[in-house]
Amino acid sequence: MSAKILDGKALAGRLQAEMAAQVQAWLPRVGRPPGLAVLRVGEDPASAAYVRGKERACERVGIASFGRHFSAQDSPAHLLDAIAQLNQDERVDGILVQLPLPPGWDPIPPLLAIDPAKDVDGLHPLNLGRLVRGEPGLRSCTPLGVMRLLQAEGIPIAGRKAVVVGRSLLVGKPLSLMLLAADATVTVAHSRTPNLAEVTRSADIVVMAVGRPRLLTADMVKPGAVVVDVGINRIQDPDGSEQLVGDVDYEAVKERAAAITPVPGGVGPMTVTMLLANTLESYKLRSHL
């Protein structure tokens, strides 16, 4: 029997419709729409596509965009100057630096320069520290999207064994803390983990976030597990065409798991939607709603 498909695209659409209605209700009280500034450096096509997707999502919800684009040959000081200006701009509730930055650009200074109250990517040390301490704060978008998707689908987390494969600051580390806060028993696996299949087979919930195409095969999943695929990989088919796949061997694993996210259409739309949610949260706090 095939797994239940965890449709992040459908949930994202419903949540964005709710957000659009909220924005319209708040506008008369605040006198301005929420504002998001996405800062992009360089000409990477994937980054440009991601930024366009975020701007389209903002338009659907009613969030004003204050994005800026910098050349890879530009001075990093110009990016820091722009962040300083946006920190003071009352029209802007959220600031995001699109990662990765081009070679030679250190991502740490711009991430540290963002006002934590406008850090809608949840990567400032203050917001990460709040996550560790279990305090309210802006959370990383992809892990937050995973949690919202699991909760919306009614998947139990408390008391379950969860394995997160990947230890990045963007996904693996914050997601493991969010699962722990939801009372899961959490194991974090990575490239140096011996007997990875043995670890993943013990899990009720498996989250893949390593960027390796189809790494998780059916024999690595126990029957009835929930599988969340955060990976996005472009591979070339024998005919030369490109295909977008996750870190999970989807067709095989869906016959063994109880529930699974597709790629595309699973976690990706939820990541963008949580960026909007974080922007609205900052807007609410700054507007005293």
Swiss-Prot record:
It holds the Pfam family THF_DHG_CYH. The keyword Thylakoid does not apply. One of its GO terms (molecular function) is methylenetetrahydrofolate dehydrogenase (NADP+) activity. Its EC number is 1.5.1.5, 3.5.4.9. It catalyses: (6R)-5,10-methylene-5,6,7,8-tetrahydrofolate + NADP(+) = (6R)-5,10-methenyltetrahydrofolate + NADPH; (6R)-5,10-methenyltetrahydrofolate + H2O = (6R)-10-formyltetrahydrofolate + H(+). Pathway: One-carbon metabolism; tetrahydrofolate interconversion. GO terms for cellular component: cytosol. Keywords: Amino-acid biosynthesis, Histidine biosynthesis, Hydrolase, Methionine biosynthesis, Multifunctional enzyme, NADP, One-carbon metabolism, Oxidoreductase, Purine biosynthesis. CDD domains: NAD_bind_m-THF_DH_Cyclohyd. NADP(+) binds at residues 166-168, 191, 232. One of its GO terms (biological process) is methionine biosynthetic process. The keyword Hydrolase applies. Homodimer. Belongs to the tetrahydrofolate dehydrogenase/cyclohydrolase family. Catalyzes the oxidation of 5,10-methylenetetrahydrofolate to 5,10-methenyltetrahydrofolate and then the hydrolysis of 5,10-methenyltetrahydrofolate to 10-formyltetrahydrofolate. This is Bifunctional protein FolD. It comes from Synechococcus sp. (strain JA-3-3Ab) (Cyanobacteria bacterium Yellowstone A-Prime).
